[in-house]
Amino acid sequence: MMKKLLLLAFIAVACEAMAQDAQCVPERAAMVETIRAYARIEANVLGPRSVSEHVLEAMGQTDRHRFVPGRSCSVAYMDGPVLIGQGQTISQPFIVALMTDLAAAKFDDTVLEVGTGSGYQAAVLARLVRKVCTVEIIPPLAEAAASVLKELGYDNVSVKIGDGYEG
């Protein structure tokens, strides 16, 4: 009986998460279009390179709302940084796109990210490279990020607690 109740509870939680993910699709698509618009506006600074379609696709496939407290679609995909706790923020989507693009990482690369935060940047990178090693100095953030990344199946991301200055 207890196993059945646990299974039902798990199914209910999974269904709720899937429904929320589906609800966020329009906000995620709007975020990608906002990034494209910023790239056009900043073309005089970025040059003809802009932000690659691979990066935009990765961001369009990554559930940003799963990496913010409360998992609110409107908050997660807004055009600005979002508080994630411990006095830290998840970067504005355009900044994530720009950093990811400027890294120019290739599929066979291993990337070291310093400052895991919520894990969102690592998740975006994980769609583009073979392996992401990320280091976070604030244990509660590292633990939360590792949990979300594992829950979402990012098996190519390794989260470590430590001072990124030490590598």
At which residue positions do the language-model features occur?
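Residues in and immediately flanking transmembrane alpha helices
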Residues: 16-17, 65, 126, 149
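Conserved nucleotide-cofactor-binding alpha/beta core module
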Residues: 104-167
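Class I SAM-dependent transferase core
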Residues: 20-112, 128, 143
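Hydrophobic h-region of N-terminal signal peptides that target proteins for export
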Residues: 9-18
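Positively charged n-region of N-terminal signal peptides that target proteins for export
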Residues: 1-5
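General helical structural elements
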Residues: 7-8, 32
